[in-house]
Amino acid sequence: REVEARARDAGLPVPEIVYEVVDHRELNAIAALGGFPVRYAHWRFGMEYDRLQKGHAWGLQRIYELVVNTRPVLAYLLRHNAPVEQKLVMAHVCGHADFFRANAWFAHTDRSMLDVMAAHAARVRELSAAHGQDALEGFIDRVQSLDNLVDPGSLRLARGHPGNAPPLDGRLAPGDVLGHVLRDAPLPDWQREVLALLRDEACYFLPQLLTKVMNEGWASFWHSRLMTGSLLRDAEVVDYACQHSGAMGGSDGPMNPYKLGLELFRHVHAHSGGGLHAVFDARAVHDDLTFVD
């Protein structure tokens, strides 16, 4: 708990975190399921696991941790991280945990989603037995192809309408395609129920898609402050510098959200005139689009 204590001393209000230490296969399997090992089974999750495993085996990528937005926050740590890596990762986790707690886009997410996912998986198994695996899997394929087409304004609605009850008429935004299909499409009852379950999950994951740069930037901002401020021993400085620079390094591939988010938060801290107060205010109200703008 030393890392959390140092984080709180530095001004970061860290909520309760439960840590699980796993090997790389277990971590890749959990990551493929979006952080929920109790989630329903589907071939796309298996395909994602295979991609993560091959990336790890070929040295193309490595997951050091996985943080899940629940209450308490659930953090999966890689068993074979070196001591300085584990310290860095735990400082990084503290940033994620605070971001989930404080950012406005997460205000209406369901923090009991671990139990909800388990209930969804049980119901999907029942429907698969009743209607056939091929029919169910084919329908889930179609829903998953649209699962980013939910509206941020629908997050609160999703909390209030579990199971197969559709949202209220007249309260759906045009961009909430899954919501409109759920309400208006002539679907059999079992398909409507599956759609409602998957839409609830899509609404849960939506804030993470909208704040990827900010979330990773906030975690990186705090791991760098904590590690260089009080957590590092003299003998660990070089190892930390190698780990940090590896995570922040640029490439010819996709944008690095860790680097971009870190530099944006450092810019706010250095140039806004508000110091840490301005940084905390920024992390509370923005998504990636408004933050970059």
Predicted ranges, named:
Residues R1-V73, P166-A185, D189:
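Auxiliary, metal-adjacent structural segments of Zn-dependent hydrolase domains
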Residues E2, R6, V93, A97, ...:
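Generic, well-ordered alpha-helical scaffold segments in large soluble proteins
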Residues V18-N28, R111-S112, V116, A241-G246:
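Acidic helix-start/capping segments at beta-turn-to-alpha-helix junctions
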Residues L52, P72-V89, L206-M214:
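Short pre-active-site segment immediately N-terminal to the catalytic Zn-binding motif
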Residues P83-L88, D115, A235-Q243:
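Alpha-helical scaffolds flanking conserved acidic
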Residues G95-A158, A219-D234, S245-M255:
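Post-HExxH zinc-binding segment in Zn-dependent metallohydrolases
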Residues L149-V213, G217, W222:
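Internal metal/ion-chelating core segments
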Residues E236-D293:
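Non-catalytic terminal regions of proteins
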